[in-house]
Structures are given as C-alpha cells and as structure tokens.
C-alpha cells in the first residue's frame, strides 16, 4: 500500500512539472508569434519561386496572414537565386526569400522569422531543408489529417561560408 502512494505521488509530481514546462513553452512561443505585429519591424519579404510550385504560394500566404508584406517573384531558374545568395546545397528547398540582409530558404515558419529579427544574429540566413509535413505550406487540410501526423523539424542557420547550426526546433 505504501509503495502505491509513493508511485502515485511521484507520477503526479512528474505530471505537474511537465505541465508547467509545456505551459511555459506555449507562452514563450505565443510571445514570439504575437511580437510580429507589436514590436518587431520586419522589412518587406522578397520571395523567389517557380510558377508550378503550389506549396511556395501557401508559404507566402502564411507570411502575409501573419502581417508581412511579400513581393512574390516567379522566376525561371530558382537555382540561380540559391547561388546568388549562397545557400548551402544540403539546405536548399523549393523557394528562397530575402528579408533585409537575411536569406530565408524553404518552409520557415513565422515564429522562426520573428526569432531571427529579435535576436539579429550575425548569419547569412535560416533554412528548413526539405519539405517537412506540417511546415508552413506543407499542411494537409482534410478530415483525415491530424496534427500528430505532422513532423518535427529543425530550422538551420547558415553563414556565407556554409557553416551551419540549429537555430530553432519546431514540434507539431
């Protein structure tokens, strides 16, 4: 009987701690997201994509829905843009953008862009390699999809010399 009490007290304590951590992380993510319109001055986004890419258009809408002004440039050769703004080969995705002096590559969420302009690190840009399911522009909207089907993914920072490091971690 005594072992049962200890087990449940320990389990309850772990639950309280994890709930508090989840709450704190949720509040922090909300602060960064809400800061876009209130405190962060993010310049106009200059986006480059091919005409045939639908997910790129959805990513642009994600930025616009979060208050950013986006110039949508449809280009014949997206790879030329990736060379012009030296994006490491292993980080390349379907679309690129410039915001002030930063390059944004792939399906980077608004929260990471906000973080970039809050911290203002000395980097060339940030990227989401590939096309993770659930990232902005890669959402599935149907009665069968659930957020738990989405992937966790990393936003990677990169320098002009190609040095990379984890900038942000995104979980569904």
Predicted feature locations:
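N-terminal export leaders
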Residues: 7-16
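N-terminal, intrinsically disordered, polar/charged segments of Gram-positive cell-envelope systems
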Residues: 34-36
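Thiol/selenol-based redox catalytic cores and closely related redox-interacting motifs
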Residues: 84, 90-172
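N-terminal, post-signal-peptide region of Sec/Tat-exported proteins
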Residues: 55-100
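C-terminal segment of classical bacterial N-terminal signal peptides
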Residues: 22-30
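Local sequence-structure signature of Cys/Sec-based thiol-disulfide redox active-site neighborhoods
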Residues: 38-60
């Amino acid at each position: 009987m005594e072992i049962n009490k200890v087990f449940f007290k320990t389990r309850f304590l772990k639950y309280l701690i994890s709930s508090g951590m989840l709450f704190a992380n949720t509040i922090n993510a909300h602060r960064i997201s809400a800061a876009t319109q209130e405190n962060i001055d993010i310049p106009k986004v200059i986006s480059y994509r091919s005409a045939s890419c639908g997910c790129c258009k959805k990513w642009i809408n994600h930025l616009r829905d979060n208050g950013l002004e986006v110039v949508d440039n449809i280009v014949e050769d997206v790879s030329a843009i990736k060379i012009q703004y030296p994006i490491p080969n292993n980080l390349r995705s379907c679309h690129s953008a410039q915001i002030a002096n930063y390059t944004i590559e792939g399906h980077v969420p608004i929260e990471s862009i906000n973080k970039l302009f809050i911290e203002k690190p000395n980097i060339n840009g940030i990227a989401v390699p590939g096309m993770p399911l659930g990232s902005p522009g890669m959402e599935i909207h149907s009665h069968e999809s659930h957020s738990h089907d989405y992937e966790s993914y990393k936003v990677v920072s990169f320098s002009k010399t190609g040095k990379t490091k984890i900038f942000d971690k995104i979980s569904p």
